[in-house]
Amino acid sequence: MRILQISDTHNKHQQLTNMPAADVIVHCGDFTEQGTEEETLDFLNWFIELPYKHKVFVTGNHDLCLWDADGIEDLPDNVHFLQDRSCEIEGLKFFGLAYNHPEERIP
Protein backbone atom coordinates (compact mmCIF):
# COMPACT_ATOMS: atom_id res chain seq x y z
CA MET A 1 0.00 0.00 0.00
CA ARG A 2 1.33 3.43 -0.94
CA ILE A 3 0.52 6.30 1.43
CA LEU A 4 0.92 9.99 0.60
CA GLN A 5 1.11 12.27 3.66
CA ILE A 6 0.59 16.04 3.45
CA SER A 7 -0.01 18.75 6.03
CA ASP A 8 0.04 22.48 6.67
CA THR A 9 -1.44 23.47 3.32
CA HIS A 10 -3.13 26.55 4.90
CA ASN A 11 -5.66 27.18 2.08
CA LYS A 12 -3.09 26.49 -0.62
CA HIS A 13 -4.35 22.98 -1.37
CA GLN A 14 -5.51 24.02 -4.87
CA GLN A 15 -1.84 24.67 -5.71
CA LEU A 16 -0.96 21.03 -5.13
CA THR A 17 -0.77 19.55 -8.60
CA ASN A 18 0.95 16.46 -9.91
CA MET A 19 0.94 14.76 -6.52
CA PRO A 20 2.44 11.26 -6.50
CA ALA A 21 0.31 8.19 -7.02
CA ALA A 22 -0.82 6.45 -3.83
CA ASP A 23 -3.58 4.27 -2.48
CA VAL A 24 -4.22 6.51 0.53
CA ILE A 25 -3.73 10.24 1.06
CA VAL A 26 -3.47 11.47 4.65
CA HIS A 27 -3.74 15.17 5.51
CA CYS A 28 -2.31 15.70 9.00
CA GLY A 29 -3.96 19.04 9.69
CA ASP A 30 -3.74 22.77 9.18
CA PHE A 31 -5.64 22.70 5.92
CA THR A 32 -7.10 26.14 6.75
CA GLU A 33 -5.53 29.42 7.83
CA GLN A 34 -8.25 31.01 9.98
CA GLY A 35 -10.36 27.90 10.59
CA THR A 36 -13.55 29.32 9.09
CA GLU A 37 -16.42 27.24 7.80
CA GLU A 38 -15.84 28.63 4.29
CA GLU A 39 -12.18 27.56 4.32
CA THR A 40 -13.10 24.15 5.69
CA LEU A 41 -15.76 23.53 3.04
CA ASP A 42 -13.35 24.60 0.29
CA PHE A 43 -10.78 22.10 1.57
CA LEU A 44 -13.34 19.29 1.94
CA ASN A 45 -14.69 19.79 -1.58
CA TRP A 46 -11.13 19.61 -2.95
CA PHE A 47 -10.12 16.65 -0.76
CA ILE A 48 -13.20 14.57 -1.60
CA GLU A 49 -12.55 14.97 -5.33
CA LEU A 50 -8.92 13.81 -5.20
CA PRO A 51 -8.31 10.64 -7.24
CA TYR A 52 -7.07 8.52 -4.32
CA LYS A 53 -8.86 5.34 -3.31
CA HIS A 54 -8.90 6.33 0.38
CA LYS A 55 -8.60 9.74 2.06
CA VAL A 56 -7.87 10.39 5.73
CA PHE A 57 -7.61 13.72 7.58
CA VAL A 58 -7.33 15.19 11.06
CA THR A 59 -7.47 18.75 12.35
CA GLY A 60 -4.51 20.94 13.20
CA ASN A 61 -4.29 24.00 15.41
CA HIS A 62 -5.59 26.26 12.60
CA ASP A 63 -8.67 24.16 11.82
CA LEU A 64 -10.90 25.70 14.49
CA CYS A 65 -14.18 24.99 12.72
CA LEU A 66 -13.83 21.24 13.32
CA TRP A 67 -12.18 21.15 16.75
CA ASP A 68 -15.38 20.19 18.55
CA ALA A 69 -16.81 18.08 15.76
CA ASP A 70 -17.34 14.42 16.59
CA GLY A 71 -17.83 13.68 12.93
CA ILE A 72 -18.82 15.29 9.73
CA GLU A 73 -22.11 14.42 8.10
CA ASP A 74 -22.35 13.04 4.60
CA LEU A 75 -18.72 12.23 3.83
CA PRO A 76 -18.21 9.58 1.17
CA ASP A 77 -17.35 6.12 2.52
CA ASN A 78 -13.73 6.44 1.37
CA VAL A 79 -13.13 9.72 3.27
CA HIS A 80 -12.27 9.34 6.96
CA PHE A 81 -12.26 12.23 9.46
CA LEU A 82 -10.26 10.86 12.37
CA GLN A 83 -11.00 13.09 15.32
CA ASP A 84 -9.68 10.97 18.21
CA ARG A 85 -10.78 7.79 16.45
CA SER A 86 -9.44 5.13 14.13
CA CYS A 87 -10.27 3.36 10.91
CA GLU A 88 -8.89 0.34 9.13
CA ILE A 89 -7.98 0.47 5.45
CA GLU A 90 -6.95 -2.73 3.73
CA GLY A 91 -5.75 -4.24 7.01
CA LEU A 92 -3.80 -1.16 8.14
CA LYS A 93 -5.09 0.82 11.13
CA PHE A 94 -5.02 4.61 11.10
CA PHE A 95 -5.57 6.64 14.27
CA GLY A 96 -6.17 10.38 14.25
CA LEU A 97 -5.40 12.40 17.34
CA ALA A 98 -6.53 15.99 16.95
CA TYR A 99 -4.36 18.92 17.93
CA ASN A 100 -6.62 19.96 20.81
CA HIS A 101 -7.19 16.53 22.36
CA PRO A 102 -7.95 16.20 26.05
CA GLU A 103 -5.42 13.86 27.65
CA GLU A 104 -8.10 11.46 28.87
CA ARG A 105 -9.09 10.68 25.25
CA ILE A 106 -5.70 9.19 24.38
CA PRO A 107 -6.08 5.39 24.26
Question: What kind of feature is each model-predicted range?
Answer:
Residues M1-L4, S86-G96:
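Beta-strand-turn-beta hairpins that frame and shape the catalytic cleft
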Residues I6-I89:
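Core catalytic region of metal-dependent phosphoesterases/phosphodiesterases
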Residues L92-P107:
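Binuclear metal-dependent hydrolase catalytic cores centered on His/Asp/Glu-rich metal-binding motifs
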